[in-house]
Amino acid sequence: MVFLLDGSDGTRNGFPAMRDFVQRAVETLNVGENTDRVSVVQYSRDAAVQFYLNTYTTKSEILDIVRGMRHKGGRPLKTGAGLQYLIDNVFTASAGSRRLEGVPQLLIVLIGGRSFDNVDTPASALKEMGVLTFAIGTRGSDAKELQKISQEPSNAVSVSDFTDLPSVQEKLQSSMETVLVDVTPEIGVELTPTTPIAEGKTTLLLDPSVHPVSWLA
């Protein structure tokens, strides 16, 4: 599971909520070299890797790093360049990706504004690679841009503010389960919040709340 976080100047106040979102997500995973792998990247004008998919193999290590993450800063926001960075540097075998082994690749993108570059080409490339992308944006983001980035338009979601991220997590979990079942050649498996759906991939289950949320398709 890869997280791409908008670390531009405009998200400074919302960064703690993004960090908490990642932390809660990681807490639900079965982290290990042969199970779930996690990477976190921040971006603004350029990208900065917090850690790669093969940097840490225990949940405690990852949580320690996530809790200590600091806001990157920078402008303008270039989401297209951030996505391209993932293609070139994160979804690769040398960085720990098992895409070529058939392990589903999940990407969650948190965006706080409109991109100053074009997202079309890298977004299409990620889809061709089979990366299952979910884009979540605040009211300052572009709804059409979120839909382009997401694997399907229905995987794009808008919240009023990053503090409302808990409100999308139940729906996100449900959508991820559906997508993973579609790409996983296993039959007759009863899904539960802790059932491994494929090697190295577990469903995401986080606590929902009642804040406003708008699914874009």
Predicted regions: what is each one?
Residues 4-7, 18, 40-43, 86, ...:
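DG-centered beta-turn motif at the end of beta-strands
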Residues 1, 26, 62, 66, ...:
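Fold-core signature of tandem repeat domains
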Residues 1-108, 114-121, 135-144, 167:
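Von Willebrand factor
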